[in-house]
């Protein structure tokens, strides 16, 4: 969430910056609530001071033996206490209203982010590799996978429903090989620490990274199937939409030493998304699934280092595509296409031959102090007593299923077989072709 000071002392300027991303901040409501809050804050402090002053008089009256006066003062103190409780309750309600509004406000775009309404106004900054020209009819990954009996959508529908997949044999092995290759690259060459994390998380974790309260419908939530058998309250958990959630929450409510920064963590996990707003989109194939695997990259940095870290992290995701020899382009998202908590985002889009277009395969974002403020994730500089908020960054390095799509389609042969990229062959026991 944004610094509350921005909504108090720089309200108009903040509204202008948010308008760049198409968000209309309710300035008048916030201004009125803030005026009421200030008034109630003053009233509360005055009542507190009056009650404290009158309370001291009780002992003085008793010391003089004037018990009648002491009783009158005690009655006054009780009345002041009731007024104070009412004022505190009203103040808490006002503060909650202000916080509810603040939680619905997205991050402020960085000045370097291009102005735009939607994905059509994103700006391409780099293109790597050249799409192949095929002398045969290109098949999509669904046809290629079903021809080889490696992708079984029918069984997945029977087991779970639409937007799920069963992979078999060498296709399942290729999926595993991709995950292993990505993890090895990021841990051995890029300096990340591998993490194994829970796939079920509590509401506090989802609040910390910004999925709650605004995006609850995009998640899969669990409900206990059995009756409560102890005094421990049953907690509602949710399946992770991305490893960003558990990995970033590692620093929630902690203070990190400056000497230990940056923290660089990676995790391979399944991800679960309801795709509530994607009805009718990408209904064929592996592009948009309820369950998919992803290797996530997370960095925790000092504020002054985060923009350079975004370039580095994005470069780490790009390296995966380059080693796999997959043509891609890099775009910076415009203000109207940015994620809720992002300050600046790069998307990497891989070439998909059957669609004759580039499709997103990684999104790398600098969240600034937006998540850190929610999580109270801080660090302490050497020689300083007061801790500061960290900056958090995350990105896909990469989405495994979409990387499968790209390999199947870009490396297809005229006979329907798939050539295995050179860097993956050691993970495939030397196999050069599948299908």
Swiss-Prot record:
Pathway per its UniProt entry is: Aminoacyl-tRNA biosynthesis; selenocysteinyl-tRNA(Sec) biosynthesis; L-seryl-tRNA(Sec) from L-serine and tRNA(Sec): step 1/1
What segments bear the compositional bias annotation Polar residues?
49-58
Residues that bind L-serine, according to the entry? 242-244, 296, 396
Record protein name field? Serine--tRNA ligase
Kindly give the PROSITE patterns that the UniProt entry links to this protein: AA_TRNA_LIGASE_II
Subunit note: Homodimer. The tRNA molecule binds across the dimer.
State the similarity comment: Belongs to the class-II aminoacyl-tRNA synthetase family. Type-1 seryl-tRNA synthetase subfamily.
Described by its record, this protein's role is as follows: Catalyzes the attachment of serine to tRNA(Ser). Is also able to aminoacylate tRNA(Sec) with serine, to form the misacylated tRNA L-seryl-tRNA(Sec), which will be further converted into selenocysteinyl-tRNA(Sec).
What organism is the protein native to?
Aliivibrio fischeri (strain MJ11) (Vibrio fischeri)
Give the GO cellular component terms, alphabetically.
cytoplasm
Domain writeup: Consists of two distinct domains, a catalytic core and a N-terminal extension that is involved in tRNA binding.
Identify the taxonomic lineage of the organism of origin. Bacteria, Pseudomonadati, Pseudomonadota, Gammaproteobacteria, Vibrionales
Q: Which gene encodes it?
A: serS
Segments carrying the region annotation (Disordered) are 41-70
């Amino acid at each position: 969430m944004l610094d509350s000071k921005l909504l108090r002392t720089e309200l108009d300027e903040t509204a202008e910056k948010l308008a760049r991303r198409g968000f209309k901040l309710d300035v008048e409501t916030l201004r009125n609530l803030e005026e009421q809050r200030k008034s109630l804050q003053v009233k509360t402090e005055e009542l507190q001071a009056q009650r404290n002053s009158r309370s001291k008089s009780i002992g003085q009256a008793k010391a003089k033996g004037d018990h009648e006066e002491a009783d009158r003062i005690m009655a006054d103190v009780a009345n002041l206490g009731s007024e104070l409780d009412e004022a505190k309750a009203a103040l808490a309600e006002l503060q909650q209203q202000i916080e509810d509004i603040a939680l619905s406000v997205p991050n402020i775009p960085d000045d370097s982010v291009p102005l735009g309404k939607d994905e059509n106004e994103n700006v391409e900054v780099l293109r790597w590799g050249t799409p192949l020209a095929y002398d045969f009819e290109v098949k999509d990954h669904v046809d290629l996978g079903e021809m080889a009996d490696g992708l079984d959508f029918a069984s997945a529908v029977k087991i779970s429903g639409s937007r799920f997949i069963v992979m078999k044999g060498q296709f399942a092995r290729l999926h595993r090989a991709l995950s292993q290759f990505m993890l090895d690259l990021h841990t051995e060459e890029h300096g990340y620490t591998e993490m194994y994390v829970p796939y079920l998380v509590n509401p506090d974790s989802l609040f910390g990274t910004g999925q709650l309260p605004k995006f609850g419908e995009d998640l899969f939530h669990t409900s206990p199937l059995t009756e409560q058998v102890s005094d421990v309250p049953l907690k509602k958990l949710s399946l992770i939409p991305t490893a960003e959630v558990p990995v970033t929450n590692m620093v929630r409510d902690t203070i990190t030493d400056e000497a230990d920064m940056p923290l660089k963590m990676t995790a391979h996990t399944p991800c679960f998304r309801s795709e509530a707003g994607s009805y009718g989109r990408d209904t064929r194939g592996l592009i948009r699934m309820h369950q998919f695997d992803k290797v996530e990259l997370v960095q925790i940095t000092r504020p002054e280092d985060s923009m350079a870290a975004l370039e580095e992290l994005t470069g780490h995701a790009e390296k995966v595509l380059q080693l796999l020899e997959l043509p891609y382009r890099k775009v910076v998202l415009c203000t109207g296409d940015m994620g809720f908590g992002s300050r600046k985002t790069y998307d990497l889009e891989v070439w998909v031959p059957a669609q004759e277009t580039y499709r997103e395969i990684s999104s790398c974002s600098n969240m600034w102090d937006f998540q850190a403020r929610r999580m109270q994730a801080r660090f302490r500089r050497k020689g300083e007593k007061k801790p500061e908020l960290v900056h958090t960054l995350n990105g896909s390095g990469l989405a495994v299923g979409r990387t499968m799509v790209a390999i199947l389609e870009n490396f297809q042969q005229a006979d329907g077989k798939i050539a295995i990229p050179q860097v993956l062959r050691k993970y495939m026991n030397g196999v050069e072709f599948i299908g």
